Amino acid sequence: MNISFKIEDVAVRAFGLTTIEEFTAFANGNLTVAPKAPNAKPKLIPMMTARRLSDGCRLAVDAGLELSLRNKLTGVVYSSLSGEIQHNYKVLLACANDTPCSPTDFSMSVHNAAVGNFTILSKASIPSSSVSASEDSFMQALVDAYIRLDNDEDRILVVDYNVSIPEFFINYSDSDLLDYPIAVAFVLAKGNEINICTQDNNEETYDNHQALTFLLSYLCKAKQCNIKGSNQEYQVNFSCK
């Protein structure tokens, strides 16, 4: 695989930070953060809608809306490793206990809840998709965006997010599982500032949040970073000015 594009805009919601300036300071070692620091209230989501969304979904929709206000988008791709596991757990718990299931939990338990709420709130009549590819969800979202750009779409919004993992699942998960909410959003356009190629990954390790690794390298103005997926290693080359 070999894909290329350029980044036109970035937004992030994580560690209690909401501006790219704060996150750039963190990426360069000039700001200390606590991974599970409380996140600020959404800037752009109505309160009644925000209450229905999982913690990471709120961040993802809010970050996407921020970029939609600054950019004329032609498509959107959301991705997530965790998906809506918070709502799923509540649905399963209700079934196991033979109790009524919350309509909100049921309707928000689908993987495209984030992108669906984004398109509704932004009133964006553009092609949208939600990518779930396990550990490789973010990188495959970039592939989806690249294909769209190659088919003459101009600007694609890519948002990757994670939610807090319910404690029940922590006992069955990898010890380095990222279990706090985070959302990273990019507007991509045609270009060659960033090139990604792949090679086999024979190790049983992977980056537990590919989008975060990618963003930190980008903000540090690194020339290259390697991101491990489940079966492939992604070599990312940055030639941004």
Where are these regions (language model features)?
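Conserved "HGTGT" condensation-loop signature of ketosynthase/thiolase-family condensing enzymes
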Residues: 1-130, 160-241
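Active-site-proximal alpha-helical scaffold in enzymes
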Residues: 61-64, 132-155
